[in-house]
């Protein structure tokens, strides 16, 4: 099954897959809040220090994504992508020029679903 979310919902979708990969093996996160909000900033370290799980991940963010006191969404998503790459996850990271919205992610969504269904 695939789980999807934007912003805190994107981090929540990843959290659900991380803790229940037998239920959700594919995650789509648009502008995921992997910043210092309820511990989501810890995921890059957890990914790097935990044996790889059976999860396929799509991340999307942009250079104008949110940047507030809890952190930079653009940098946080780049850190997530780097951690996933480090461990050898099947992942895709689309980094665009947009902000904290679904314009970019929505434009990619059909292709994202095709990629999610493809064997990696």
Model-derived regions, located:
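Non-catalytic cap/lid and distal C-terminal segments of serine-dependent acyl enzymes
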Residues: 1-120
């Amino acid at each position: 099954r695939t789980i999807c979310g934007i912003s805190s919902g994107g981090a929540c979708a990843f959290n659900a897959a991380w803790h229940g990969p037998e239920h959700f093996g594919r995650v789509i996160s648009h502008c995921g809040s992997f910043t210092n909000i309820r511990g989501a900033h810890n995921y890059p370290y957890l990914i790097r220090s935990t044996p790889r799980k059976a999860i396929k991940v799509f991340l999307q963010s942009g250079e104008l994504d949110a940047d507030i006191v809890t952190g930079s969404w653009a940098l946080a998503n780049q850190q997530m992508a780097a951690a996933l790459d480090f461990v050898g996850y099947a992942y895709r990271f689309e980094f665009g020029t947009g902000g904290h919205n679904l314009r970019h992610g929505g434009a990619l969504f059909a292709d994202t679903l095709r990629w999610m269904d493809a064997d990696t």
